[in-house]
């Protein structure tokens, strides 16, 4: 009986120990287009507190918006879209980017910041109690399907169920149920590491995704 409870207790203890090191900060970071982002400190890392919405790389070059599903599915260069190609979704959930935009040498993140690496996501997960528990404190307190109060501490990360855009046909996973977030770390020639959260549990899952899928993006201060 005690052995079965140990992983749960360990996760709870880790969350209690490190929640003190998690805090929203009064400063904001501003991207090239003038969009501002709240920031949150988790351990020694400082993260953006909402999904990226920028439309230009750091050098000023425009990132193309691609609405056409067939074109999206065959892209090998950076692009963004709104979920379901509706700006009102972007106003709430931010933009979806393919990994080619994440990896573009012109820079997707604001100056002095970078798109979170796979290693940084893994550290974040450990700080918040491990994969099975880390999603709960990261999630926003609203907009998730079947949202129920879990009594957990929210830390200002405000992960939203922004959905995703598929690589096979360019169609959308609509908002409300899932958050998919890129890392900047390639896993192989066709895919990169990512993280996912679902409405149905508290996990922050690690996985690989094809590079022309559209996911949300979070940044970490250099």
Residue ranges and their predicted role:
Residues 2-11:
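Bacterial N-terminal signal peptides that target proteins for export
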Residues 13-17:
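Hydrophobic core
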Residues 24-222:
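Conserved positions within compact, well-structured domain cores
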Residues 20-21:
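C-terminal motif of bacterial Sec signal peptides marking the signal peptidase cleavage site
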């Amino acid at each position: 009986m005690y052995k079965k409870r140990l992983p749960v207790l360990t996760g709870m203890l880790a969350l209690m120990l490190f929640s003190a090191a998690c805090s929203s900060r009064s400063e904001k970071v501003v991207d090239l287009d003038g969009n501002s982002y709240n920031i949150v400190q988790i351990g020694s890392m400082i993260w953006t507190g909402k999904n990226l919405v920028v439309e230009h790389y750091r050098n000023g070059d425009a990132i193309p918006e691609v609405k056409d599903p067939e074109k999206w599915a065959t892209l090998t260069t950076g692009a963004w879209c709104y979920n379901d190609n509706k700006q009102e979704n972007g106003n709430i959930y931010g933009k979806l980017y393919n990994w080619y935009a994440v990896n573009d040498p012109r820079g997707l993140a604001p100056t002095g910041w970078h798109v979170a690496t796979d290693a940084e996501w893994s550290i974040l997960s450990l700080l918040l109690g491990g994969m099975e528990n880390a999603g709960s404190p990261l999630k926003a307190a609203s907009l998730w399907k079947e949202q129920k109060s879990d009594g957990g501490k929210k830390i200002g990360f405000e992960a939203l169920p922004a959905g995703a855009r598929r690589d096979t046909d360019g169609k959308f996973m609509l908002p409300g149920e899932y958050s998919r977030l890129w890392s900047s770390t390639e896993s192989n020639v066709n895919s990169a590491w990512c993280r996912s959260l679902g409405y149905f549990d508290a996990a922050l899952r690690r996985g690989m995704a094809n590079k022309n899928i559209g996911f949300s993006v979070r940044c970490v201060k250099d």
